[in-house]
C-alpha cells in the first residue's frame, strides 16, 4: 500500500483529502487533492471556482478512482491534473459493469466532464499514465449529455494526454449526425491546443469517434498512438470536425500511429484547410465506409502511409480511402495493398482533385498518380488476409520492406517543409537523399551481402519473459516499442534470449535480428506483451 498506516484528515479551505480509502460526492470549491490508494465515488462530484476564481482537481499517482454507481466527475471553469508514472498509473473505472454492453441500461459510470464557459480561458488539462474504462453514455440520453463516455473536454486552453489507456468506454447511438453524440474514449471541443501521444485506445464504441471525437480544432496533434478493436461507424480511431483553417494555423497532424483491427471507418477527417497525415500504419480495419474519409474542402497532405488489407463492403468508395468532398489533397509515397471496396482499392477521387506522386498499388484504379508503381511492395510479413479477423499478434505481421522491394528509394522528395523527418519507428526518413514508400524506411541494402536466417519469438503473446531464437550465428537481437525506443539489445550465439519483460508496458513490440558487425537485417517480427 502507499502508506504503512491509516490516517485521514480534511482541510475545508483547500479541499485537501488524504487517506488510504476515501469516499467523495457533492459540491466542492477551489483546489481539491485526491491522494489516496482508493477514491470511492459514491455520488456525483462537482468542482467549481472559489472566491478567488480557482478550481482544480489534482489526482496523485497510484490512485484508483472507482465509481460505485452511474456517477460523474465535473470540473466547471477549472483545470485537471492526473499525472501518474510508468509503474504507478492512475485508474478511473466503475465497480459494477453488469449489463454494460446493453446500450439502454444505466451501468458503468458517467466519466469525467471538464467544461469551461469560454474558449479564451487559461484552464488546462494534463493526463499522463492514466487508465479510463467503463464510462458510458446510454442510448436515449438527453441532448447535451451524449458526448464523451470516458472523458468530455470543452473550451480548455491546453490539453495534453500521454501514455494513457482508454478502453471499454461506450457511447450509445443517439442519431446519425455528429451533433447527436460521440467520443467513446474522449470528446474534445474548442481546445486552444490538443496533443495526444503514446496513448492506446482499444475496445471502445461510438457511432462517431469510438476512440477520439474532436471539434473546433486549430492546433491538434495525435502521434505515436495505437488504436485497435474499436467499433462504430465514422472514425473508430479519429473523428475530427475542425472547421475552416487559415494558412496561419498549424492544422491537424496525425502521424506515427498504428491503427489496426477496428470495426468501422478508421478515420473521418472533416476539416477545411491543410492537415498532415504521415507515417501511419492503417491495416486490417473494416467498415461500411472507406478507411479514411474527408467530407470538407480539404487540402491535406497524405505522405508515407501504409494502408493495407482493409475492407469496405457497403459504401461507394475505396477500401484504402475515400475523398468525398471537393479538395486538393497531396498524396505522396503511400502504399495501398490488398484493400477492397465496391469500386476502388485505393482512393475514391470522385469529388476531389488530388495531386498524387509515387504511390504503390497492386493495380491501377481510383486516384492515378504520377510515377506510381503497380506491383507487390514485398512486405517482410503482411497479415494473412482482409479485415480484423486477420489482425492477430501471433501472425507476427511486420510492414517493413524486403530487400528487392520496388518501393525502396523511389519516393518523391518534393514535399517542402511537409517532408517527414522520421518514419513510423522513429528512424530517419531521408537516407542519402532518398525516401522509401510506406510508413517504415528500410535499411540501406546497397552492398549488403544477402544472409538467410530463421528466427522466432515466443511465447507470443507473452507476459514476463520473451525468448528470441535464431539460426544466424553471431547475431544481435534488438527489441523496440511502437515509438522506436530500443528496449533490449543482446548478442546471441545459438542460444535463445531470456529477456525479462515484467516491467515493460503492455502493448506491441518489434524485434530484429541483425548480423553482428554489419547492418544486415536478417529477420524481424512482432511480439505482444499482455
Which residues does each PLM region occupy?
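C-terminal accessory segments
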Residues: 371-441
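Acidic glycine-/aspartate-rich tracts in secreted/extracellular proteins
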Residues: 63, 85-87, 96-99, 136, ...
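Bacterial Sec-dependent N-terminal signal peptides
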Residues: 1-21, 460, 527
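Low-complexity, Pro/Thr/Ser/Gly/Ala-rich linker/spacer regions in secreted
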Residues: 441-453
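Beta-strand/loop edge motif enriched in small/polar residues
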Residues: 20-271, 284-288, 311-313, 319, ...
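Predominantly extracellular beta-rich ligand-binding scaffolds that present long acidic/polar faces
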Residues: 240-398
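C-terminal outer-membrane/trafficking sorting elements
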Residues: 450-458, 462-530
